[in-house]
Amino acid sequence: MKSFMDENFLLSTDTAKILYHDYAKNKPIFDYHCHLNPREVAENRQFNDLAEIWLEGDHYKWRALRTAGVPEELITGKATNYQKYLAWAKTVPLCIGNPIYHWTHLELRRPFGITNMLFNPQNAEKIWHQCNEMLQQPEFSARGIMQKMNVKLVGTTDDPIDSLQYHQAIKNDESFDIDVVPSWRPDKVFKIELPQFNDYLVQLSEIADVDIYTFADLKKALLKRLEYFDAQGCKSADHGMEIVRFSAIPDESVLNSILQKRLQNQPLLEEEVAQFSTAILVWLASEYCKRHWVMQMHIGAIRNNNSRMFALLGADSGFDSIGDRAYAYPLSRLLDAMDKENQLPKTILYCLNPRDNEMIASMIGNFQGDGIAGKIQFGSGWWFNDQKDGMERQLQQLSQLGLLSQFVGMLTDSRSFLSYTRHEYFRRILCEMIGGWVEKGEAPNDISLLGKMIEDICFNNAKNYFK
């Protein structure tokens, strides 16, 4: 019987162990998509206690707590941090079988070095004091943890109207050698159907100093913000797409009419929504190309399902789930519309429903080219899929329908400074899969060849892709 989460956790073959320990383990982390607050990096936040760094804003843990019957007061309510922490300690033993159980223990091991005890009510007080003592030390500040975890770059997620003042402050600080770059997230612009669209355009108009009455005005305002983001080191644009729409792009006069209807709070037809979003996205893609940005699309979530809790807590509080809309055809047409004028940028497609894995893995092959290795990527298992089975499925299906060797690898997609251990989880799963191929005679026992492939997937490919 193997020990629980020992140094060879998830590694069952000799080849897998060699690939992980000699090639994957010590590669730096290139975390090209996350939701860290750049202010916390700029100000080098020192966390007061373990609950603050561990439970604050982590909707994965919040969902587990609710499922275990913990009152909301002890999750997002006014209970003390220690009370919330104890509720988490009681919940974790109930999570066996869920990746949260593994993540929790990985997060205690790195960076805190706690390897000799399980997280449960019996050990909770000891772990609390031990970790809190470390959290008061400079090397366990926000920046300190990033450095301990060997992070080289993080790409945050930022609205076009964000000031990016904290990115600028980090960039100007020569004492800190980790790149923290913004990523453009224009969801509130291309989703004309959102109730807050008009209010958002007022904000965009103010920050860009452009009156927005026409489609040309909107592009002018966005162009100013694109240039500003580019000057701040932006390398990527991300798009949350609950629905993938496509319609032939009409004349600009039609787009002006659609925009005017929306500004006057008149209801739009679904066709008009699709025409507008297609026009904006295709134009944005051409601008990304000019700046050599990567375009990311996160497809298929159903957000804010629980209207009562949304009213209480707002978005990103643990009430989202997997959607099941069919979108292969509109996605194909949208990418093709971008590609027709050779204005399809490097692109990463993520699907939330694993049903769509093979569809996405085959779709990316339609638009490869331009002498760019892995120009169009099937993104790593996202959200509900960034667990063992989900990662294995994505890796296997990418390898079967594409080129695994060109994959840009893992990302945290997280708001937590402790989530870098997800890269370790991914790397172990990757090495186990490839090591298994060798043991079964399905891949050559050429460690130098496979080791380079592992190093590329863990770091080198992403570094080269996000230039």
Curated annotation (Swiss-Prot):
Keywords: Isomerase. Signal peptide: none annotated. GO terms for biological process: D-galacturonate catabolic process; D-glucuronate catabolic process. Its EC number is 5.3.1.12. The keyword rRNA processing does not apply. SUPFAM superfamilies: Metallo-dependent hydrolases. Disulfide bonds: none annotated. Pathway: Carbohydrate metabolism; pentose and glucuronate interconversion. PANTHER family: URONATE ISOMERASE. Belongs to the metallo-dependent hydrolases superfamily. Uronate isomerase family. This is Uronate isomerase. It comes from Haemophilus influenzae (strain PittGG). The gene is uxaC.
